[in-house]
Regions:
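Membrane-helix boundary/interfacial segments in multi-pass membrane proteins
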Residues: 30-43, 218-231, 262-302
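Membrane-interface helix-loop-helix junctions at transmembrane boundaries of multi-pass membrane enzymes
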Residues: 105-118, 198, 203-215, 240-270
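Membrane-embedded helix bundles of polyisoprenyl
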Residues: 2-10, 14-104, 116-138
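Conserved small/polar residues in nucleotide/adenosyl-binding loops
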Residues: 310-312
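Membrane-embedded alpha-helical segments of multi-pass membrane proteins
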Residues: 42-51, 86, 90-91, 233-236, ...
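Periplasmic/ER-lumenal interhelical loops and adjacent helix-loop junctions
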Residues: 132-244
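Short secondary-structure boundary/capping segments
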Residues: 37-39, 92-95, 139-155, 278-283
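Carboxylate/His-rich catalytic cores and anion/metal-binding grooves
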Residues: 2-31, 234, 238-275
Length: 312
């Protein structure tokens, strides 16, 4: 529902919005985190699209209604208590804000943009204020955890200012593994599973005299230590998103494309260490989070949005 409401705010046809919202809600990542019991992450992903919709309305539509919606949605988002998900969507919001700022400057609407920015900032302050107590104690106690760094020598899990780079990037998405977004099980299934005894892999191995070997081989051959399954967005959804990129107006699509590219590069983690090290050093707060492959949640949100843009 949150995704559908965001699409209505953007101006998508309600029926198209239903299809796009289902593409978001039925992506495999939701099923994986529900099965793993990541309830706070799930709720953060539920509220995030509405927060983005509020930001869209504030910067492009009715500024006061947008600010009110942003304050409400951001309050719920922060209250879901998964700062990592919130952080990634705020990065996407920043991409949108930068895009609007550049366009406003070119069109001579800088004063209006600054007013809308002030309203958006006020909404953010209200959202933070409504969650001040848990945020305060989280920030206070994080200094005593591995996310707060260490005054002693760096360990395998901590650095001077936050998590150690190797520890934070342990769950890095492989470059080829990114094709899981389009092709199901491109790098295999979840860790701990093996190939079926009556499958084609077993048949080929049997021809070489390796009977029973298929039941001892892992059905996942990606670069992550283990995984609950691939992040599959749907071939149809990705194809329609590509069509949306080709046909949509530039104002609507470039910031989304930029956010997707950045998030995919960040998800590669140790497989693109130069970019990851740069983000760790210079992107505020980024070194507090592990499992960098989680940045793909923004791509999961962006693909249904991109496929809807051709109807705006």
């Amino acid at each position: 529902v949150s995704m559908w409401l965001m699409l209505l705010i953007v101006g998508v046809n309600p029926w198209v919005g239903i299809v796009a919202a289902l593409a978001y809600g039925l992506s495999t990542y939701f099923l994986l985190i529900i099965g793993a019991g990541h309830v706070t992450k799930m709720w953060a992903l539920v509220y995030a699209p509405l927060m983005m919709g509020g930001g869209w309305m504030t910067l492009r539509g009715n500024v006061w209604c947008g600010a009110a919606l942003t304050a409400l949605a951001a309050s719920l988002e922060i209250g879901a208590n998964h700062p990592q998900i919130t952080y990634y969507f705020l990065v996407a919001m920043a991409a949108f804000w930068i895009s609007e700022g550049i366009l406003s400057f070119k069109e001579g609407r800088l004063r209006d943009f600054l007013l809308r920015t002030a309203a958006l900032a006020a909404a953010g302050i209200l959202a933070v204020g409504s969650n001040f107590s848990p945020l305060w104690y989280t920030a206070k106690h994080s200094k005593e955890t591995i996310r707060g760094g260490s005054e002693l020598a760096a360990t395998a899990e901590t650095s001077k200012n936050g998590l150690a780079l190797d520890y934070a990037t342990a769950w890095s998405y492989g470059k080829a593994e990114t094709l899981n977004l389009l092709v199901p099980d491109f790098m295999g299934r979840e860790s701990g599973t093996t190939f079926p005894a009556d499958g084609q892999t077993a048949a080929v191995l049997n021809d070489y005299g390796l009977r029973g070997a298929a039941q001892q081989l892992s059905a996942y051959w990606g670069t992550q230590p283990y995984t609950g399954g691939p992040t599959y967005l749907g071939a149809a959804a990705v194809f329609l998103a590509a069509l949306g990129i080709a046909l949509a107006r530039g104002r609507n699509k470039w910031w989304i494309i930029a956010a997707c590219v950045v998030m995919i590069l960040l998800a590669w983690g140790r497989n693109l260490m130069g970019f990851t090290e740069f983000a760790f050093k210079y992107l505020p707060g980024y070194n507090k989070f592990r499992t960098v492959s989680m940045t793909l949640v923004v791509v999961q949100w962006a693909v249904p949005l991109l496929l809807s843009l051709i109807h705006i």
